[in-house]
Regions:
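A residue-level marker of the well-folded mature domains of exported/periplasmic proteins
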Residues: 2-5, 18, 22-387
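Hydrophobic core
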Residues: 10-18
Length: 387
């Protein structure tokens, strides 16, 4: 059973998403390219964001047509998710319409509407904002088009058939446990200073990440073993709109200036993912002169793995998108053939209309001691990628 903190965060999530409304943009990422009003192309096709809408495959196949909607090409992980899924679906005999929406909600809504009207028989959607797709998905429901929410749960829509993701609560607990173990919180005298940085408030996953980590760390904060010098501990305060590197960096700049400029030691920064960890690292390099703190992350993006190798980031949760893509292809194939998708969780993920049957893949963490085995030996990256 999830603990009280996670339950509280999810109640808050429901309130936030109800207030967000359809089409709410929630603030866009500061690093968004100037051409982001354009529809992004398939990562397999042109990578120029000005290239316009791209249908990833136009060849008719016997398997049927699957629409795959990804949020943005701004983050490396979504490129990998999209291309991995596209390749595996094509290999399984399906035509694929893969679209990226440049983190623009109206663009994603339009892309999904086009998928519905162009004959897609099933949709796989990684939403930009979990509460923004209810209206367009009513159209999918009316046409009996099954929907798999991919990695981000789509909220308040009974059109969602399945959810495929990694165990997001476990992601957070692994990050919290890493900090606990590295600081030896059960034995060391302390106190230790920590700051907290999590993700987009419109992304339901961010609350699971933060909830899992805080279920590990909160007892040490309550006991005074961990001290948040900034005083910023509630989810809404430590959230980072659009997981923006620049936003995380600006916030960390202010925290360092107010709390650590006098030489006070910062021992750890809980970062829920790699884009926020990169912002924290950039800020520390520019503003912090003390001993380097523990920094967590998630996704094993190339710049962050390079930072792990050089000692600037301590760890990153590795979510092998090939594994998730493979599972989604299994789910799609089962449903398209008239069966039920394989799931392993039927209790955890309630999107406001009921519990969504889910398949959860298990994450692992990478650090300087095991990244070669996890990332290079497995073929996820080459050594040249990390030079």
């Amino acid at each position: 059973m999830r603990k009280k903190l996670l339950s509280s965060l999810l109640v808050t999530a429901m309130a936030v998403t109800m207030l967000a409304g359809c089409g709410s943009n929630g603030g866009q990422q500061a690093s968004t390219p100037a051409t982001e009003n354009k529809t992004e192309t398939s990562a397999e096709a042109k990578t120029d964001d000005t290239a316009g809408t791209d249908t990833a495959s136009t060849t008719t196949t016997e398997g049927g047509k699957i629409g795959v909607a990804m949020p943005t090409k701004d983050l490396q992980r979504w490129n990998q998710d999209g291309t991995n899924m596209e390749a595996q679906l094509k290999e399984a005999g399906y035509e694929v319409d893969l679209q990226y929406a440049s983190n623009d909600i109206p663009t994603q809504v339009s892309q999904i509407e086009n998928m519905i009207n162009s004959g897609c028989q099933m949709l796989v959607i990684a939403s930009i904002d979990g509460d923004s797709l209810g209206t367009v998905l009513e159209q999918a429901k009316e046409k009996d088009i099954p929907v798999i929410a991919y990695d981000r749960l789509i909220m308040n829509s009974d059109a969602v058939t399945y959810y495929a993701t990694f165990d997001n609560y476990m992601v957070g607990t692994k990050q919290g446990e890493y900090i606990r173990d590295q600081l030896d919180l059960d034995n060391a005298a302390g106190p230790f200073n920590i700051e907290l940085v999590t993700g987009d408030p419109g992304d339901n996953n961010a609350r699971f990440f933060f909830g899992g980590a805080m279920d590990v760390l909160q007892p040490y904060i309550d006991a005074g073993k961990l001290v948040v010098k900034s005083g910023q501990t509630d989810f809404e305060t430590v959230a980072t709109a659009n997981w923006s590197t620049e936003t995380a960096q600006s916030r960390m700049d202010a925290i360092i200036s107010a709390n650590y400029a006098d030489g006070t030691k910062l021992d750890a920064v809980l970062c829920s993912n790699d884009s926020t960890a990169l912002g924290v690292t950039n800020s520390l390099e520019a503003n912090y002169t003390g001993e380097w703190p523990i920094i967590t992350g998630q996704d094993c993006d190339k710049p962050n793995v390079k930072n792990m190798i050089s000692g600037k980031q301590s760890m990153s949760i590795f979510k092998d998108t090939r594994t998730l893509a493979s599972k989604v292809v299994e789910m799609v194939d089962a449903v398209m053939k008239g069966g039920e998708a394989p799931v392993n969780d039927t209790t955890t993920y309630d999107n406001g209309t009921g519990v969504i049957p889910s398949y959860l893949c298990e994450p692992v963490f990478a650090d300087a001691s095991n990244y070669k085995e996890l990332l290079i030996d497995s073929g996820y990256y080459t050594e040249a990628d990390l030079k």
